[in-house]
């Protein structure tokens, strides 16, 4: 948990007055930490309490800096009636985004649907190294979310994967997240996606459609 002290320096009559304000959010998080120190609390309960604290922060904090990137959003339902979460890899710049806020926004976006079956569509199109967070952050996210996030995730579609993406997904799902290994599906073309979801509902950015035509020809394009 992070603790924040905000120092407000005011200058008057040549003297410096320091006003120290304790962030109420940090006080609440500190209380959770104190409760988790109790030996009687089992690991599952501790994890749930930490996540509940994270969920509270996700609802209360200002996350517009992440929301404005539009890198993750809900996009209706697939053809089996499952909620769809869209992740645009190119719009996620880990060097320019607060990763703690990114996690909070992910939780705010995804948590309302995880009690039912849902799928994720990840567009790897035209990404660079700056769009790919560290393995340790991905592991942190996976270990932070609750069981429902993993159990009710029915498919994770990677659109326009590279060889590196395939190898990374295989390694992570084999050694760190075997519960989702069989849920990862690589899709080389948007036509592969059309059998699963209504593409019009996904709000696919134009650059993805353009790149798909470069990679796969004009078979996708429908004027």
Regions found by a protein language model. Name each.
Residues 2-223:
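Basic, amphipathic alpha-helical/coil surface patches used to engage anionic, phosphate-bearing ligands
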């Amino acid at each position: 948990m992070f603790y924040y002290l905000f120092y407000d320096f005011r200058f008057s009559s040549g003297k410096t007055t320091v006003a120290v304000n304790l962030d109420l959010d940090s006080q609440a998080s500190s209380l959770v930490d104190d409760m988790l120190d109790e030996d009687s609390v089992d690991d599952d309960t501790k994890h749930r309490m930490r996540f509940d604290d994270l969920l509270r922060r996700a609802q209360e904090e200002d996350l517009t800096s992440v929301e404005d990137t539009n890198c993750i959003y809900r996009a209706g339902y697939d053809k089996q009636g499952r909620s769809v979460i869209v992740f645009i890899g190119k719009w996620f710049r880990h060097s320019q985004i607060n990763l703690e806020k990114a996690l909070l926004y992910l939780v705010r976006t995804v948590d309302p649907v995880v009690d039912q079956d849902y799928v994720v569509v990840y567009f790897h199109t035209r990404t660079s190294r700056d769009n790919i967070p560290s393995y340790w952050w991905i592991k942190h996210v996976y270990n932070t979310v609750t069981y429902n996030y993993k159990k009710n995730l029915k498919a994770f579609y990677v659109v326009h994967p590279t060889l590196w993406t395939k190898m990374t997904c295989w390694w992570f799902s084999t050694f760190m997240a075997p519960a989702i290994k069989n849920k990862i599906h690589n899709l080389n073309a948007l036509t592969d996606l059309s059998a699963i979801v209504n593409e019009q509902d996904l709000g696919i950015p134009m650059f993805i459609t353009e790149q798909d035509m470069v990679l796969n020809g004009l078979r996708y394009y429908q004027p």
